[in-house]
Curated annotation (Swiss-Prot):
Biological processes per GO annotation: thiamine biosynthetic process; thiamine diphosphate biosynthetic process
Protein name as it appears in the record: Hydroxyethylthiazole kinase
InterPro entries the UniProt entry points to: Hyethyz_kinase, Ribokinase-like
Reaction(s) the record says it catalyses: 5-(2-hydroxyethyl)-4-methylthiazole + ATP = 4-methyl-5-(2-phosphooxyethyl)-thiazole + ADP + H(+)
Family affiliation: Belongs to the Thz kinase family.
Role noted for this protein: Catalyzes the phosphorylation of the hydroxyl group of 4-methyl-5-beta-hydroxyethylthiazole (THZ).
CDD domains linked: THZ_kinase
Length: 294
């Protein structure tokens, strides 16, 4: 924490914006459309509803593009792929970009497989507004897009499926570079990157925040990160990217802590998590620990 009054004032303003985002989602029930993986689609939709939003799930390019016209934001997750996705996802990303639509990307298992790599590489010039992933995915995406200077690239350990094998601290520089790249091409003139881990990180490329808290039980259910991406899109429908990424991450930290106390294992934890997403207050989210770092 900083003793600089200007820093404290800025953090206070940010907390107020986070509280407003949580309040607005529950008051406006914004639609966030998801093109997400088959394994976690149910949890993604239910989490968006529990957070206060509205969900729509689709895979056909013309359907996604049409729904994007009425959606507040969109979410693309590359966790499970079919052959036609190799052409469909780049087309969807290009149309979202051309139409000035905001969207969240979860680059699940970035660096594994030629098809996934080709899809993620195609997003470089028509990028999302927010990227949310684990440290290994963020480092891999930064490398794919060639954003680092040759002498400053932090090599990623080979991804272990959808699980991170890199620590969040190793992804700080990559996250900042990605966020600045997103901002340059964003329809709202800003972008953000959220890195999930033991202590989450969120950055817009200029300001960087660490978010202590959350529950290790999140790693014991499938779809925790995927559903967080969906809820991030829900918040992006009502807030600017940095606030949306922070609000969603903090909501999940608080909800997962509550769910862990109320559950006996992974099955009951998932149910308790949805209940907690519904019940956590805007004040609780905004009052969470937020540490601004360099």
């Amino acid at each position: 924490m900083s003793d600089d009054p200007s820093t404290n004032d800025a953090l206070g303003t940010l907390r107020a914006a986070i509280k407003q985002a949580v309040t607005d989602v529950r008051g406006q029930t914004p639609l966030a459309q998801s093109f997400t993986n088959f394994v976690t689609i149910n949890l993604v939709a239910n989490a968006q509803l529990a957070a206060g939003g509205t969900a729509a799930m689709s895979y056909l390019p013309d359907d996604v593009i049409a729904t994007a016209e009425i959606a507040g934001s969109n979410y693309i997750n590359v966790g499970t792929l079919l052959p036609f996705f190799k052409n469909a996802l780049p087309e969807i990303a290009r149309k979202l970009h051309e139409n000035g639509k905001t969207w969240v990307l979860d680059p699940v298992a970035a660096g594994i497989g030629e098809t996934r790599t080709a899809i993620l590489e195609s997003f470089r010039d028509v990028p999302p507004t927010i990227v949310r992933g684990n440290a290994s995915e963020i480092i891999a995406l930064d490398a794919m897009w060639g954003l680092a200077d040759a002498d400053s690239t932090t090599p990623a350990t080979r991804p272990a499926g959808v699980e991170a094998v890199d620590e969040v601290d190793a992804a700080v520089d990559a996250a900042k570079r990605l966020a600045r790249h997103l901002a340059k091409r964003s329809p709202v003139g800003a972008g953000a990157v959220a890195v999930s881990g033991a202590v989450d990180l969120v950055t817009d490329g200029e300001r960087t925040f660490r978010l202590p808290g959350g529950s290790a039980m999140m790693t014991k259910i499938t779809g925790a990160g995927c559903s967080l991406g969906g809820v991030t899109a829900t918040y992006l429908a009502v807030a600017e990217p940095l606030v949306a990424a922070l609000a969603a991450s903090l909501l999940y930290d608080r909800a997962s802590e509550i769910a862990e106390v109320k559950s006996d294992g992974p099955g009951s934890f998932q149910v308790a998590l949805l209940d907690a997403l519904w019940n956590v207050t805007a004040d609780q989210v905004a009052a969470s620990d937020i540490i601004e770092t360099n």
